[in-house]
């Protein structure tokens, strides 16, 4: 009983820490406090560490647009019963906070410690639902962000995990991502009457995703670091020809939720987005990273 009381006291102290952490936006603090209380009540002693990365860790969280990206380090492998409870918790959080998707992974403390020598498999959640398992590698953008920028909510600081991340290998994999995912994404948008074709006309999310997505890679290839979507847009404004400034400003406008568009025609906006992506892909491929 004394152990249980001690654990709850420590847990409540961590909730107090969340409330007073200036790196965490207020509404995210509310969401996390509810989530962690649910988790502590239904799966006590599961968490070994809990961290935020992504836009929050970069100081670029946009309410109504940004996800809440997390990495949960857990004490043990998850049973089917554990997974069922996590599914319900994430479903409830998503229902209560539909504008802030709590997206992240659950990895055991043994696996995250061993991540420096080999890739590990972990389960992950997105938009309130379990998405199955994914392979986590130390030379990935997720681990790089966690290690270098992560916000510690529970457990030791991310830098204490002592990963030896190989930047050139990470850059090489990001370039592979550019020439597979992003090239194919752009091609689908160019295909007449495809779903992506219509998304680029009517879905503001697609314009933002495409334009700022490749801009982030362009920033990383040139500056050997990472930045937020808006940060990448601002960087591009200062480093690409004026021809592209209009579509970049439009993408940042959509990201920030500003109402006034830079375009009168959704067709012109779509065409500029695809042309800009083509330009950035070509410019990025002029750089080479050797593993």
Go through each PLM region and give its residues.
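Helical scaffold of the NTase/Pol beta-like nucleotidyltransferase catalytic core
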Residues: 15-51, 81-83, 290-291
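Nucleotidyltransferase catalytic cores
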Residues: 160-291
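Short, well-ordered alpha-helical packing segments
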Residues: 36, 40, 87-94
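Soluble or luminal CAZymes and related metallo-dependent hydrolases
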Residues: 27, 31, 85, 268, ...
